[in-house]
């Protein structure tokens, strides 16, 4: 699920916006459950928890994520799925370090560690893997010009929303593969279930609902392999969201939020 949770995509350069997003360091905890509308799913029950920690330094940003899912098949078999993600991206978008692990029933099935470096966002980047075990497909040696790293995409999406855009397209790289991502954005006019969870300081903060579809660049049919719908605020916090693939769907509900101060880099 790592690539499906993170990937994002379809312009060659970061979008030009009139107002930049002010992302805030934070920690968020989500309870995960079965999304009832998922069709043809092999699972009868899904439970889990996700912890997300976003932090800023004076030279870049870090993203740490742990997700645990307990899946029960229709035959009663229980599967324990864990995903660990750690990213560091420089502010200029020239460098990204990534450390990714996926486990099934406590056995490591995917492990990726490496670095991407490029002269600028508008130029191709070189991928160097320290470890690459488990993922399908050929190892990528070069990231295409204009591809956004995960946190770059988040920043670009929020900036587009602040600017009033209703559609945002991008090409993204998540440490393993390039995806094309189409996002449809609309202002959130209702407070939502999360109103009782987010800090009072966010009571008057703008938020949006976005439907985000992920496509493989070389797919024969323009059908998304993964979709998510989420509420997000202008400070970077995500509220409740869904994750849906062809045969699998999860609902995540925001349960805990901690906001932290931005670093003083003057």
Spell out what each predicted region is.
Residues 21-25, 53-62, 88-94, 201-203, ...:
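A short, structured loop/turn motif at beta-sheet edges
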Residues 1-5:
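Positively charged n-region of N-terminal signal peptides that target proteins for export
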Residues 19-78:
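N-terminal cleavable signal peptides for secretion/export
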Residues 65-120:
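Hydrophobic/aromatic-rich structural module bridging two neighboring secondary-structure elements via a short loop
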Residues 10-19:
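Hydrophobic h-region of N-terminal signal peptides that target proteins for export
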Residues 99-266:
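Mature, soluble, non-transmembrane domains
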Residues 28-30, 48-50, 63-65, 83-85, ...:
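Hydrophobic residues positioned within well-ordered beta-strands of beta-sheet architectures
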């Amino acid at each position: 699920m790592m690539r499906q949770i993170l990937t994002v995509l379809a312009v060659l350069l970061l979008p030009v916006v009139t107002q930049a997003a002010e992302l805030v360091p934070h920690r968020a905890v989500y309870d995960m459950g079965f999304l009832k509308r998922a069709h043809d799913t092999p699972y009868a029950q899904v439970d889990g928890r996700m912890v997300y920690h976003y932090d800023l330094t004076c030279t870049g940003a870090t993203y740490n994520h742990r997700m645990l899912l307990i899946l029960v098949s229709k035959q009663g078999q229980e599967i324990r799925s864990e995903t660990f993600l750690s990213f560091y991206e420089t502010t200029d978008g020239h460098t990204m370090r990534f450390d990714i692990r996926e486990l099934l029933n406590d056995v490591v099935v995917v492990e990726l560690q490496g670095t991407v470096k490029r002269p600028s966002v508008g130029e191709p980047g070189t991928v160097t893997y320290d470890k690459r075990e488990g993922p399908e497909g050929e190892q990528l040696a070069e990231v295409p010009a204009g591809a956004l790293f995960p946190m770059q995409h988040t920043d670009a999406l929020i900036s587009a929303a602040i600017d009033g855009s209703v559609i945002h397209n991008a090409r993204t790289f998540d440490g393993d593969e390039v995806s094309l991502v189409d996002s449809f954005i609309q202002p959130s006019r209702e407070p939502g279930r999360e109103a009782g969870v987010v800090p009072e300081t966010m009571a008057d903060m703008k938020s949006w609902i976005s439907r985000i579809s992920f496509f493989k660049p070389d797919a024969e049919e323009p059908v998304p392999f993964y979709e998510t719908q989420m509420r997000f605020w202008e400070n970077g916090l995500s509220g409740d969201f869904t994750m849906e693939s062809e045969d699998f769907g999860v609902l995540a509900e925001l349960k805990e939020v901690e906001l932290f101060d931005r670093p003083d880099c003057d």
